[in-house]
Structures are given as structure tokens and as C-alpha cells.
Design a protein with these regions (language model features):
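Switch/communication elements of ASCE P-loop NTPase nucleotide-binding domains
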Residues: 3-8, 13-14, 21-184, 189
Length: 190
């Protein structure tokens, strides 16, 4: 991301709109800067003084924003032959760690909305998310049911432990057009 003010303001607004907190960068007086987090209705705090989840979460959501609003438009997503020029993969390992369930749910919604946005723009952006978060999984299903995300845009692979007597190591689950999980193991979330 360039240091251009419009990019900074765009990022700040996107975070505020999608995650209901604000970020700000302030000089600290020692030649350094402080990254401030302000949750809705609360006082702003230095990143080091808020929950550990923010320090893990911010790089992830900045990467998503940068990919769809800076990288993809600059890559000219489609050439004259209607072929995708550049693929972007964003990998996430347990993004729910240290996050409040409300932020997990918002992340799930943003992932689903980003997939729909990229499909509409013909951007080749793919996410690989390893998660155990019921909030993320349910938010994606809700986006399918309520906001029209194509369920074929989401693949779910379940990795089973053969040592626990499971027949298959990898099984595929999926969402119905109504956002319901299909072929989901009974008791997985309980």
C-alpha cells in the first residue's frame, strides 16, 4: 500500500465500516508512531494496550483490503483475451484465535463479501482458511442465504483423524443455496 492519504483514509473507512472499530496512527514524540485502536463508543488505546487479537487481526484485514482495493485494480485483473492475469492467494491459519466471537463473525462476513465482490469484478482472489470457528462458518452461511453469495464459491474440506477410526481422512462439506451446511459431521461444533 502506498503512503497516499486516499489509501490510508480508504483503509481506515473500510475497517470502520466492516469491523466497527477505528485505527489511527499518531506520532509518539520519540520519532516513532503509535497505532491506536478505537472501538465504537470507547476511548482509543495504543495497540499494545488492547487485546492480543488486534495485533494478529490487523495484518490480516489490511492484507485483504490491500489485495482487493490496491493490488487487483493495479494488476488489471483481466486482459483483452478475458483471461485472468494474476492470482492472489490469502492463507489464514485459525484467524479466530484471540478474537471476540463478534469479530470472528464480522471476519466471516467480510470473507464472504470479498469473495462475492471479487467474483463480480472477475478478480482471481482465493482464500484458504483453516478454522474451528462456528462464528466464521455460520457468517459465511448467512451471507449465502441473505446476500446471495454463490455457494459454489465456497469449498469446505474436513480433515479427520484416521487414528480415531474415521473412514476417510478428507471429506467435503458444502453449503446449500439456503446457506445450510451439508455433509457436516454431527456434533462437530458441540
Amino acid at each position: 500500500m502506498s503512503g497516499a492519504p486516499d489509501n490510508k483514509e480508504s483503509l481506515k473507512q473500510w475497517i470502520k465500516d466492516n469491523f466497527l472499530f477505528e485505527i489511527d496512527i499518531e506520532p509518539s514524540g520519540t520519532g516513532n508512531v503509535e497505532l491506536k485502536i478505537k472501538e465504537k463508543g470507547k476511548q482509543s488505546h495504543n495497540l499494545i494496550d488492547v487485546g492480543f487479537g488486534y495485533s494478529q487481526f490487523l495484518p490480516l484485514i489490511v492484507k485483504i483490503w490491500k489485495t482487493i482495493y490496491v493490488d487487483m485494480p493495479n494488476d488489471a485483473a483481466i486482459d483483452g483475451d478475458n483471461k485472468r492475469k494474476k492470482e492472489h492467494f490469502i492463507l489464514m491459519e485459525q484467524p479466530e484465535l484471540h478474537l471476540h466471537p463478534k469479530l470472528q463473525e464480522k471476519l466471516g462476513r467480510v470473507l464472504a463479501q470479498t469473495v462475492r465482490f471479487c467474483n463480480d469484478k472477475k478478480y482471481d482472489v482465493r482464500f484458504l482458511v483453516e478454522t474451528h470457528s462456528e462464528a466464521i462458518i455460520n457468517a459465511i452461511g448467512s451471507e449465502i442465504a441473505v446476500n446471495g453469495l454463490n455457494p459454489d464459491s465456497v469449498n469446505i474440506l474436513l480433515f479427520n483423524a484416521k487414528s480415531e477410526g474415521m473412514d476417510k481422512y478428507v471429506e467435503k462439506a458444502y453449503y446449500s443455496k439456503d446457506g445450510y451446511l451439508m455433509n457436516w459431521p454431527i456434533g462437530f461444533m458441540s
